[in-house]
């Protein structure tokens, strides 16, 4: 999974000593990198976890300061997502540059990528920026979360202002009718079509989704008949398409921060992560 971007290495190295942020500190990331891996039939589950453990071992051995977490699909095509966050694009650049200079880490990741690639049908990468004004009480600490709803909105060209108004109206309705609602909104800036927005909503249990469905009527009541009519009309006018997917966190394929591990060691440090393999074991020939 873990591929450090070659793109950012081409940028001007300004302030190369800037601190790389940990991906899982208790603040909302400004820059979010999502790598997607689409698995071949029969290559998910334990088979993929074993391949991904090589990345986790390599990062742990290098004591790499930037962390990531993985999720696997519960809907749609069989795939895994790997999320890494940064305080800025400069931090992302510096992280990639430092990894390139670490020969042992780079070699271990190259071997892991080769083996992991045998399981994949395809892979891609997207870069997103946090849109605070479009978010509602986002959760900065996901260490206790176990599931993630991912909603993708494709906004029509020239309709950004209308889209902002739609989100503003929806936020007001949820704040009034469903005070426990929360989400983080991210806009895709690289790796996809323009006008793509990602709404992420995490859950401790799927029972929270049951409660949300049962409470939808509260949102409708908060908006009122005229408000819902206006919202629906504006949404249809500015949004070209949407999709909704559900994912489960995967601790076996994640490289969590110490804080996350301390919050729930039984979950975030499964046996497969307990002891990274010795460096000599990494030097096997490629198949």
Predicted regions and their residues:
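Positively charged n-region of N-terminal signal peptides that target proteins for export
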Residues: 1-6
């Amino acid at each position: 999974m873990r591929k450090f971007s070659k793109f950012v290495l081409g940028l001007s190295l300004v302030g190369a000593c800037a601190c790389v942020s940990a991906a899982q500190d208790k603040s909302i990331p400004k820059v979010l990198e999502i790598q997607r891996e689409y698995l071949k039939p029969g290559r998910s589950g334990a088979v993929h976890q074993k391949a991904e453990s090589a990345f986790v071992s390599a990062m742990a051995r290098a004591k790499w300061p930037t962390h990531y977490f993985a999720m696997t699909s519960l809907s749609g095509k069989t795939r895994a997502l790997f999320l890494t966050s940064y305080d800025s694009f400069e931090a992302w650049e510096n992280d990639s540059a430092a990894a390139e200079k670490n020969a042992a880490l780079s070699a271990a990741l190259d071997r892991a990528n080769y083996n992991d690639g045998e399981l994949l049908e395809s892979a891609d990468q997207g870069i997103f920026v946090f849109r605070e004004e479009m978010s509602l009480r986002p959760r900065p600490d996901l260490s206790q979360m176990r599931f993630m709803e991912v909603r993708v909105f494709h906004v029509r060209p020239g309709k950004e202002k209308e889209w902002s108004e739609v989100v503003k109206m929806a936020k007001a309705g949820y704040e009034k009718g469903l005070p426990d609602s929360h989400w983080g909104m991210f806009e895709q800036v690289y790796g996809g079509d323009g006008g793509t927005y990602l709404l992420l909503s995490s859950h401790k249990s799927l029972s929270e989704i049951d409660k949300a469905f049962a409470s939808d009527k509260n949102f409708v009541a908060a908006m009122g008949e005229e408000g819902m009519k206006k919202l629906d009309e504006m949404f249809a006018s500015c949004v070209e398409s949407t999709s909704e997917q559900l994912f489960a966190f995967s601790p076996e394929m994640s490289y969590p921060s110490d804080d996350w591990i301390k919050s729930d060691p039984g979950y975030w440090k499964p046996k497969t992560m307990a002891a990274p393999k010795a460096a000599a074991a990494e030097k096997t020939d490629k198949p």
